[in-house]
Regions:
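Cytosolic catalytic domains that perform sulfur/thiol-centered chemistry
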Residues: 1-487
Length: 487
């Protein structure tokens, strides 16, 4: 198929470009993008004129039809308004992708399903047609992009220059030594945050020493990834299994320090393996540099401390301190950590959800463990009053989950965002000076009562979109050893 060759749909199911454009705001129409999530976010996977998606589209990659079970498919379809009685339009790169989902929808009783047979490339080629995309999509890279880079190519949205790839985790060099992506160096989060200071970011002098020892300058393009593995939240160091969250923690601190271009591999190690790309076992040592190039921190606004968190709380109209924690943590049933005793929440915060426990982020990821479609994330935040016009700081227990959500806000182009570094660990240690609440907040209790639904310890009624995935890929690794010192 040539670049602009239309996808051929049946005449009775085809929808024209003009009609589709005229119906972009039709509340009775669900437009479904079945391309890979990277394309939806903004990557030009087929070299099209523009990247992104048709405004108002919901993402349902065709790969989900074979990667998750039938019950999960039904839930994902329903959560996106792809249900019987709705009008649905499908579009993609490949006619086979559309045909497969069209057949599945027919089996689910959807009769009003039409195909945008001109295809995405035709839409993208017309500058008069609107396109939406993730504002900073290029900071969330996909496996093919990284493969091209490692093979010496010039992938899209990369201007050349020096780059480094890091396998990130919390104190498990054995995982890196078992195997890792070709050319990757090892990065222990303990080199960037301090276990002796409740895992807050290290001092500017320590960060300067750490990044220089890793060969990083402010102008180095840094790509990070992690490996999510099976484990028990009650084991001594469960954070060692949350590789992708660890990678976003490293990313946030590197951006705070002053690295201009830091990117995350969406899906991490698992997606590289799924693509069939090679791994290596060679332990690579970094080449230190003499100077980082700028003073640290260059972006102090990206990570804030307790006084700034209190200032944000004092400005309820123009700011939001967002709790990226489970509902049980939020209402004080559990602390979420085996090393944090007190349970509860920061008084005046806004609940932002996370996943099943302190080491999972399913609420922010898809069923295949990549970033959840950003319109869903932003819509959920908006329902809670978390909007880009406000000063928003995210917190969790020690900054990891907060870093992942901070990164998603950064990808969406939000500018006044931060991680409250000390989080619940710091706040809960001084309840006399730091107000704490437990129980269901009054506004959420009212929403529950108004809905007429029970609230059996889970998130309050009315949460938008898909909840925790039940099929995120997992692999097994060793338990690891004690944290290593800064190199």
């Amino acid at each position: 198929m040539t670049l602009l060759e239309p996808i051929q749909g049946r005449p009775d199911t085809a929808i024209s470009t003009a009609e589709l454009r005229s119906r972009l705001d039709d509340p009775d129409l669900t437009i479904v993008d079945v391309r890979p999530m990277a394309a939806f976010n903004g990557w030009r996977l087929r070299g099209e004129a523009r990247g992104g998606h048709i405004p108002g589209s919901v993402a349902f990659p065709s790969a989900w039809l074979t990667s998750v079970d039938e019950a999960e498919i039904e839930r994902q379809l329903a959560d996106r308004g792809i249900v019987a009685g709705r009008s649905v339009v499908l579009y993609a790169y490949d006619p086979a992708e559309v045909a497969e989902l069209e057949a599945r929808l027919a089996a689910h009783g959807l009769t009003d399903v039409r195909i945008f047979d001109a295809g995405w490339e035709s839409w993208a080629a017309d500058p008069d047609l609107p396109v939406d995309r993730l504002a900073n999509f290029d900071k969330l890279v996909h496996t093919e992009w990284l493969r091209q880079l490692l093979d010496g190519g010039q992938p899209d949205a990369f201007d050349g220059g020096r780059f480094l790839l890091f396998h990130v985790n919390f104190g498990v060099p054995e995982e890196y030594e078992e195997n890792h992506l070709p050319g990757a160096l090892y990065l222990d989060t303990n080199w960037l945050e301090d276990p002796e200071n409740i895992w807050q970011r290290r001092s500017p002098a320590e960060l300067d020493r750490a990044v220089r020892s890793l060969g990083i300058t402010s102008d180095t393009t840094v790509i990070v990834y992690g490996r999510d593995t099976e484990g028990d939240a009650n084991e001594k160091w469960p954070g060692r299994r949350a590789g992708q969250i660890a990678a976003t923690r490293a990313l946030a601190i590197l951006r705070y320090a002053g690295v201009k271009d830091v990117r995350l591999l969406d899906g991490g190690y698992d997606w590289w393996v799924r693509a069939g790309y090679p791994l290596e076992t060679v332990r690579r040592e970094p080449t230190p540099v003499e100077s980082f190039g700028v003073s640290i921190p260059q972006r102090p606004d990206y990570i804030v401390d307790i006084d700034e968190a209190k200032s944000i709380l004092a400005d309820q109209a123009g700011s939001a301190l967002v709790s990226v924690r489970t509902w049980k943590e939020h209402i004080g049933k559990v602390s979420g950590y085996n090393y944090i005793g007190p349970a509860g929440r920061i008084a005046g915060d806004v609940w932002g959800n996370c996943g099943t426990d302190a080491y999972h982020m399913q609420h922010y990821r898809t069923v295949d463990n990549t970033m959840r479609p950003y319109p869903e994330i932003v819509a959920n935040w908006a329902e809670a009053g978390i909007t880009p016009d406000k000063r928003v700081a995210f917190y969790c227990g020690t900054g990891w989950r907060a870093s992942e959500t901070w990164f998603y806000a950064y990808l969406a182009g939000w500018e006044r965002i931060a991680v409250y570094d000390g989080g619940w660990f710091e706040w809960s240690r001084d309840p006399l000076n730091n107000p704490i609440e437990v129980g269901v907040p009054q506004d959420e209790f009212a929403a529950q009562a108004g809905s007429g639904q029970a609230h059996p310890g889970g998130p309050p009624p009315g949460a938008r979109g898909p909840g925790p995935s039940r099929t995120a890929p997992r692999t097994r690794t060793s338990a690891g050893t004690a944290p290593r010192p800064i190199p």
